[in-house]
């Protein structure tokens, strides 16, 4: 396998259909509840296994993708360390997801790296073990390794499979970078949303507890949300900056996308309760 290129490993985006912050622990981490669903819009990674342990990354965005570079290479190095694998890899990243938008681009790239190389290096680690490695790289990485829509709580690491409606989404991408750390450190952030139980999950009132604060700090996010709310139920994902509106039909979302002001960018994607990475793995 050392010379064979394994192409088209998807690293899908996710949406937080809601994000509720329930409190703050003594160690500073926040207790939260959120609902993750994937969309069929992805980065793509290609891998070529090498006989030496060296790791090399190429991307279509050069230095602009430095954060993702780090996570991809750190993921590969961690897998080498945990598994004792002496092989290496040359990796190509086709970056399509916006950086720092709250849709999980860097975390998803890291997860796909772990899943793909676990297969290509034949290291045979279980999904649970890969998820434990992924958690060292970021709180969202295990969700992408798990590959199923999930209700998450705790600091985001406790996952339960759920099956929300697979809507069509119009995702809008404000041209701002939101610092997750700054949002979670802000004293104005609500931290007292009552917890939902799994039984009341689908009937509960969904919101993003970070949304008002991010909109206040970033007028472009507020403007984008206000525009989208004219057409559909809309929320921010994660700590932003991306916002999404949900539609029953693809054409409805495309029609609204066609009305998008020239200073906004967006995409239409389908919700998916099984990720494209999980589907790719099932085909092997």
Curated annotation (Swiss-Prot):
Coiled-coil boundaries: none
Isomerase is among the record's keywords: no
Pathway participation: Isoprenoid biosynthesis; isopentenyl diphosphate biosynthesis via DXP pathway; isopentenyl diphosphate from 1-deoxy-D-xylulose 5-phosphate: step 3/6
Keyword list, A-Z: ATP-binding, Isoprene biosynthesis, Kinase, Nucleotide-binding, Transferase
InterPro entries per the UniProt record, alphabetical: GHMP_kinase_C_dom (IPR013750), GHMP_kinase_C_sf (IPR036554), GHMP_kinase_N_dom (IPR006204), IspE (IPR004424), Ribosomal_Su5_D2-typ_SF (IPR020568), Ribsml_uS5_D2-typ_fold_subgr (IPR014721)
Lineage: Bacteria, Pseudomonadati, Pseudomonadota, Gammaproteobacteria, Alteromonadales
A GO molecular-function annotation: 4-(cytidine 5'-diphospho)-2-C-methyl-D-erythritol kinase activity
Binding positions (ATP): 98-108
Transmembrane stretches, start-end: none
Reaction(s) catalysed by this chain's protein: 4-CDP-2-C-methyl-D-erythritol + ATP = 4-CDP-2-C-methyl-D-erythritol 2-phosphate + ADP + H(+)
Similarity field: Belongs to the GHMP kinase family. IspE subfamily.
Matches recorded under HAMAP family: IspE (MF_00061)
Annotated protein name in UniProt: 4-diphosphocytidyl-2-C-methyl-D-erythritol kinase
EC number: 2.7.1.148
Source superkingdom: Bacteria
Residue numbers annotated as active site: 14, 140
Name of one Pfam family that matches: GHMP_kinases_N
Function, as annotated: Catalyzes the phosphorylation of the position 2 hydroxy group of 4-diphosphocytidyl-2C-methyl-D-erythritol.
GO biological process: isopentenyl diphosphate biosynthetic process, methylerythritol 4-phosphate pathway; terpenoid biosynthetic process
